[in-house]
C-alpha cells in the first residue's frame, strides 16, 4: 500500500509517494501557475501526481489515498478548499476534480492525511 502527499503552495506544488513505513520513494515538484479559476493549478497537480506515481513504478490503483496540504480554509469532509488567500480557490471541490483527473479514489484535504502520507522532507528539496 502506498500514499501520495501533495503540498499545494502559492509558489510551487510538491508531490511524493511513500510506503507504509513512511519512506519517501519518489518526489517531484512544479511551479504553481495561477489563473483566475484555479483549474490550471488542479490540472498541473494531476499531471504531477501521475508523473510521481509512474516514476515510482506503481499505478494509481496502488495508492491507498492522497492527502493535500493547502493554505487557507478547507472542508475536509466535502473535499473543498473554502478559501485560500494565495490561490484562486473559493469553494473549490478540489478533491473531486483531482480524483476525476487522476483516478485516485480517496483524496483528503487535511494535514493529518498529508503527514500520514509521510512527508517529512518533502518540502525540503
Which residue stretches match the model-derived regions?
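Feature marks short, surface-exposed loop/turn motifs that line or immediately flank catalytic pockets
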Residues: 34, 72-74
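Glycine-rich phosphate-binding loop and adjoining helix at the ATP-binding site
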Residues: 38-46, 64-65, 75-125
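Conserved active-site "lid/cap" helical segment
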Residues: 44-60
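Glycine-rich His-Gly loop
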Residues: 8, 71-72
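Short loop/turn microsegments at loop-to-beta-strand junctions
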Residues: 13, 69-70
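Short glycine-rich, Thr/Ser-proximal phosphate-binding strand/loop in the N-terminal lobe
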Residues: 2-47, 80-83
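Short glycine-aspartate micro-motif
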Residues: 3-7, 62-67
